Amino acid sequence: MRFLDIEWGSSEAKGDGNLKDYFYEFPGFDMIMKGNYRYIIGRKGTGKTAVIEVVKSKVDKDPLAFYAEMSLKDFPITILKELRDKGFAGKAQYVPVWEFLILSQICRTIIYKDNGTSSIESVDDLRRFYEDNDIENLSATQTLTVMKERNSKFQISALLKYLQSTVGFDKKKSMTMVMDIHYQKISLAIKELIKTIDTQSVYHVFLDELDEEFKSGDKSNKTLILSLLRAVENLNTYFADNTSVSFRPLVALRSDIYNTLQDDNDTNKLHDFIFKLDWSIDIKDTKDTDMSIINIINRRINFSDEGKNCSWQDIVRDDAPDYIRGGIWSYITSRTFSRPRDVIKYLKICQDKKPIHDLSFRNVESSESVYSEWFYNEIRNEIYTHLPVWDECLNVFRDIGYFRTTKDEFIRRIQTRPRVNKYLQSSGKIADDLIEQLFNFSLIGNIDDKGRWSFKYKDDDALWNNEADLILHFGISKKFRLPTYRR
C-alpha cells in the first residue's frame, strides 16, 4: 500500500460520498443513533457535521426512520427576533417561534416522507393545513419569511377541531370555518393532532451550522441559541410524555459557543444528553475502539486498501531525527488542535508532494509551510468574532523571532500597536484579557522552566498561568518562519 494511493476524503463532510464507508464509529456513536445524546459539542473540525451526515445515511437505509434538517446558515435572524413573543423576557420570548419551526419540519416529514402511519384522517388534516397555507414544501428559513409576510398568522380550518380541545373554542362553530390564527395557537393544535397519530416510525431533526450567524458579544444571538435549546427540550419532553411519535433531535454546536452559554442554568440540565467530541492523539497502546484520531486515519487507510487491514505503520517510514520526540506522528499532531480535520489536511498536503512510496519526515517537513498557512486561516475563521486583534497580538512572536516569550515582554510589545490599544480602549479590556483569550483558543500556551507546556486544546480545564512564559502554537510557527525545535 502506497501513501500516495490513500483516499483521505473531502475537506467537507457534506457531499463526501465515501464518508459512510470510512467513517470511524467512535465510542458513543451508537448512543447518538439511539437518541440518548441529542447535542454534539466540539471545536470546528472535530467532526460534528460528519456525525450528522453518517446518521442521515443510516436513517436513509431504515424503512421506519425519516429526517428533516434545519440550519442557521443564511438564517433571517432579524425576522425571528421580530416574531418573538413580547409577553415574555429573555430566552422565553423566542421559544414559541423555534417550536413552530421545528414542529413544521416534523410535520412535513410525517406528511410527505412517511407512508406508514395508520392515522390517515389526522395526517390528511395536517396535509390540508400546510397545502391550504401554501407552506408544504418550505424550509425553516422560508417558513419564517412567510410568517412575517402573514403577520404571524395562518388559516386554521383543517386544524380547528384540534385547537378547540386545547383552548376552548365554541364547538358549535363550523369545523370548516376559515380563520387566521396566530402561529402559537397553530402549534397547540398541531401538538394535539400529533397525539392522535399512531406510528412505529422514528423522526429525526438535525440542527447544524448554528455558528454561521453567531457573533461573540451579541447577547441577543446568545439568547437565540439558548431559546433554541429550550425549544428542543420542550418538544422532546412533549413527544415522549404525550405521544407515540418518536422524535429524535440532534443539535451540533461549536464548543466555543457552548462555553459562552455556561452562565445559564438550563445548560446544566443538558449534561446527560451532551456528547463532546474530544479526540486523543495517542498512538501507543491505542485500541481500535478508543476515541483516538489514529483510528480515523487507520479506517481511511484500510478503506483505501480494500479492507486488507493496512494501518499507519504500513504507509510511514518513520525516519524523523532523534531530536524529534515521538516521530512523524507526534510532529504532525503537535501542529494541530487534536482535530481530525487538521491531521487529515496535513496528510493531504503531504500527499500533494507526491512521495515515491512511504511518507517520510522529509515529506512532512517540506509540507509544513503550506499546512501552517491553511491552519492560520482556519484560526481566523474561528476567533475573529471573539478577538478581532488576534493577528496583531500573535505578530509579537514574529517580531521577537522565536516561539517563546515572557508575559511582560509580550505585553510591552502589544501595547506599542495602535490597533490593539484602540481595541483595548473601546472594549474596556486590559492586556491580560487578550492573553487569556488567546490561551482559551489555544493559539498560545504556557511553558515552564523545565520545558513542559500546557495548551487549552490538550486539557479543557487548563487555566492560563500568568507567571509562566508564553509559547506560540507550533501550527502557526512556520507561517511566521519561526524555529520550533533546536538541533
Tell where the protein language model's regions lie, with residue ranges.
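Short secondary-structure boundary/capping segments
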Residues: 83-88, 220-223, 264-270, 350-353, ...
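C-terminal leucine-rich, beta-strand-based interaction scaffolds used for sensing/assembly
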Residues: 11-12, 72-73, 318-487
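Short, hydrophobic/amphipathic alpha-helical patches that form generic packing surfaces
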Residues: 96-111, 295, 299, 345-348, ...
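Walker A/P-loop-proximal flanking segment of P-loop NTPase domains
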Residues: 1-92, 469-487
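P-loop NTPase nucleotide-binding core
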Residues: 43, 49-204, 213, 258, ...
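Short, solvent-exposed segments of well-ordered alpha helices
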Residues: 89, 93, 177-180, 197, ...
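The catalytic "switch" region of P-loop NTPases
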Residues: 184-206, 210-321, 325
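Flexible secondary-structure boundary motifs
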Residues: 16, 21-25, 304-316, 417
